């Protein structure tokens, strides 16, 4: 999700494993570019491996703290900045996209079989959300 306007940037359907979501996130972030970008995520993203991979790609991890019986993977270099304080609100916007997909986009229950078809329908629903969001953004500026 793009933070400024809440638009879906990329989608990826993965098998339900404990690490698939993090692996897909690393694949979807851009390679080393000129500008530093951030990646927001929930507690699942607060791991040493993911933070290391993101920093190698010049991506700043803005992940929720996972304080259950271990130390944080993100250090004070990241958490002290004002942009990090904005990340929880942006993460909520990302969850709103999935809420829209489940209620309006009819993706609460998978109605198709086959990974390729389910992936296509997920991307199609994300595009529908994108169009709905674009309509609101254009209407707000008119």
Regions found by a protein language model. Name each.
Residues 104, 108-110, 135-142:
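A short, flexible helix-boundary coil/loop motif
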Residues 26-28, 80, 117-118, 127:
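Short, charged/polar low-complexity linear motifs in solvent-exposed/disordered segments
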Residues 43-120:
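Helix-centered, glycine/charged polyanion-binding patches within enzymatic domains
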């Amino acid at each position: 999700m793009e933070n400024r306007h809440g638009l879906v940037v990329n989608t990826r359907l993965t098998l339900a494993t404990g690490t698939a979501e993090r692996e897909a996130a690393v694949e979807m972030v851009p390679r080393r570019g000129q500008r530093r970008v951030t990646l927001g995520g929930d507690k699942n993203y607060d791991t040493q491996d993911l933070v290391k991979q993101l920093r190698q790609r010049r991506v700043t991890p803005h992940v929720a703290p996972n304080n259950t019986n271990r130390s944080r993977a993100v250090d004070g270099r990241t958490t002290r900045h004002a942009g990090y304080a904005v990340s929880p609100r942006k993460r909520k916007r990302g969850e709103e996209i999935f809420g829209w997909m489940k209620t309006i986009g009819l993706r609460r229950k998978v109605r198709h079989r086959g990974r390729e078809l389910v992936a296509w329908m997920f991307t199609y629903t994300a595009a529908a959300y994108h169009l709905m969001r674009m309509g609101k953004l254009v209407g707000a500026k008119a």
